[in-house]
Each structure stands twice: as structure tokens, then as C-alpha cells.
Amino acid sequence: MSLDLNSATGMFLGLAIGDAMGSPIEFEKPRPRDNYIRRYQSGGFHSVSKGEFTDDTSMALAMADALIESQKTNGYPFDGHMIMNNFLDWRYNGKFSPREKCFDVGLTVNGALWKYKEDKTTPFTGCTHYKSAGNGGLMRLAPVLIVAKNKAEAIYLARESTRLTHGAEEALMYSEIFAEEVWDGCILPQYVDYRHPLDIDRDDVSSGGYVKETFQAAW
């Protein structure tokens, strides 16, 4: 996105902070407007400590590390095998995790990593069944959006990075849409109060792992 260092850092920190603030209330129903989360909490499904991030940030860190190494080695940031090997290092060795072990992994991601661990012929091992359209690929998009040089590349990298672990067309589509919307938002000359056509009433927003629900909640 040709971002300066401060902007790129802000995007990545925003991912990690949102992850850490949201993880204690993961899978809960929407809260009343006067009961928003305004500071770090502990607890939740994974018994996180205050400020502790989860698999979403860990996988984004793993991807960012691979993008940097691929740029140095290959002259181009995206290398699916490098990314997947980093994902394996996180899953089985705890690298990139705040606890030095993997304590949170989705079923779709876990299946894709196990498949790649057994056969590294291709890095794109995400399940293509429509019921596997989880949000894992969408949640870790920041690194590829930072390195993309234009909107077309941002959309392409969003799809390819998602396809590593999530092959369902719906999961790929929402990553592409999100990449395009973020890119368009970042190149606007000033802040725009933008409401996406997919906006729904906040009481109807769900907080499960389905990619469409996550997209709607974020937007």
C-alpha cells in the first residue's frame, strides 16, 4: 500500500489490539451501546490474560515474517511454502505465540496445516467445502495489504494468502472484498464516514467464526 512505517505499524498494532480486546468476549452476543469494551480484560473461551493476543495475530506475525524473508530471498514477498512453514512452526512449536505454544487454532486452519505437514507438494491446502468458509484468512490480512503495491495486487494477495488455509469460495471472496475496501479507504484524501451496503442492525450481528458474519461485524 506504499504506507510509511508509522501507518504500517498502526495497521498491524490495530490488528493485535483488536484481537486482544476482543478475545475475552469471543462468541458472545452484541453488547448494549453503554457497555462497550474500552480496556483490556482477561478470561473468555481461552482464558486469556489482559492484553494477550490469539491465533489471529500469531498467524499474521508468522505471515509477516515469511513475507520479509521471501522479499530478501526471492525479490517478491509472497511465498506460500514459507508462510505455511511458519504456520507449522506456530502450530507445533509455539513460535509467534505469546504463550510460546499454540493455544487457539480453528478447525479449518488445523486441518489445512495437518494436510500440508503430511504433503508439502502445494501450500494451498485449505478445504474447499462451502461449510468451511471460516474467518481465519480474513483476520490475518494486514501483512499482505501492507506489502501490496496497488489495489490489484492487494486483492490478489488477499485471495492467495487466504487460500493457503481456506479454500471455500466464500472465504476467498470476502477477503478480496475486504482488501479492496481497505485499499480504497486508505487512498482517500480525507476521512470519509463510509457505510457499506452490507451494514445490518447491530442486534443482528453474529460473532461466530463464519466469514460473512465477521465481515459484517467489522464493517
Question: Residue spans of the language-model regions?
Answer:
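Structured, active/binding-site neighborhoods that engage oxygen-rich ligands
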Residues: M1-W219
